[in-house]
Amino acid sequence: MKHEPWLKQWLPLIEACPRSMAWDIGANDGTWTEMLSALFVNVVALEPDERCEPPAGHTYDRRAVWSETGEETLYRRTSALQTSLLPVHDIGDGKAKVEVFKKATVETVTLDDLAAEHGPPDFIKVDIEGAEVEAMAGATLPCFSRCRWLIESHGVSSGVGCQLQRLGYINCHLIKHPHPDAAEGHEWIFVEP
């Protein structure tokens, strides 16, 4: 949370959930991985951009979360913060223009398959640069209706909301990005059962 201090207000709700398993989807520099490791018995961190190194004592699953398990193209941008499975991603990094400089094929995994591998999560943080709706489409198991989610939305809050409704969530907390240079539609969504 060091890069997103305005999210600290939600920490008590994260701490209030069962503490067995947390997932950090889009781990990037590992800030959330480290914080979640202090709160949860197990943390699964996924980060497909190999420029992003995990914090000491942690490892990253290098797959990307998507609607289907298989392979997809990863669009690496000049800023690793903006790497995405989407060829066009205009939201994030303030008003800076970030170009795709390299494409790579990466393995993908659904949230359902992650649950089969690791067990059901109690908390899921998602920050995958616009691919949130596609990733959530791969969550169909009942366990995804019983956990807490914090999703960074990059202009797709309506689609994320539809996925959350499909999972049975009724009340969503929408957290607008407070930075004056934040792009329109750059926000977080927190839900709990």
Q: Which residue stretches match the model-derived regions?
A:
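Phosphate/nucleotide-binding beta-alpha loop and adjacent structural elements of enzyme active sites
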Residues: M1-P193
